[in-house]
Amino acid sequence: MIFEKIKDLIATQLSLDTSTITLDTRFKEDLGLDSLDALELVMEAEKTFQINISDATLQNFKTVQDIVFYITKNTS
């Protein structure tokens, strides 16, 4: 469920088909996400999942799986 929501957020933000986004998709290398795109994505994720993601944590997200794991771990 979290993965599906994150896929939707990414696809909407970057105008992509959700089928192109996997857990192993890398934000910078595969999606071309720059720092502004990453910040916007995190802000949407924070709203959607009602959590706070620090700037330091944001910098550690390299793949879709990283953010999915973080959200899974920090929501209950």
UniProtKB/Swiss-Prot annotation:
Its main location: cytoplasm. The keyword Lipid metabolism applies. One of its GO terms (biological process) is lipid A biosynthetic process. Residues 1-75 form the Carrier domain. Pathway: Lipid metabolism; fatty acid biosynthesis. It is found in: Cytoplasm. GO terms for cellular component: cytosol; membrane. Keywords: Cytoplasm, Fatty acid biosynthesis, Fatty acid metabolism, Lipid biosynthesis, Lipid metabolism, Phosphopantetheine, Phosphoprotein. Pfam families: PP-binding. PROSITE patterns: CARRIER, PHOSPHOPANTETHEINE. SUPFAM superfamilies: ACP-like. Gene3D superfamilies: ACP-like (1.10.1200.10). GO terms for molecular function: acyl binding; acyl carrier activity. The modification O-(pantetheine 4'-phosphoryl)serine is found at residue 35. 4'-phosphopantetheine is transferred from CoA to a specific serine of apo-ACP by AcpS. This modification is essential for activity because fatty acids are bound in thioester linkage to the sulfhydryl of the prosthetic group. Belongs to the acyl carrier protein (ACP) family. Carrier of the growing fatty acid chain in fatty acid biosynthesis. This is Acyl carrier protein. It comes from Aster yellows witches'-broom phytoplasma (strain AYWB).
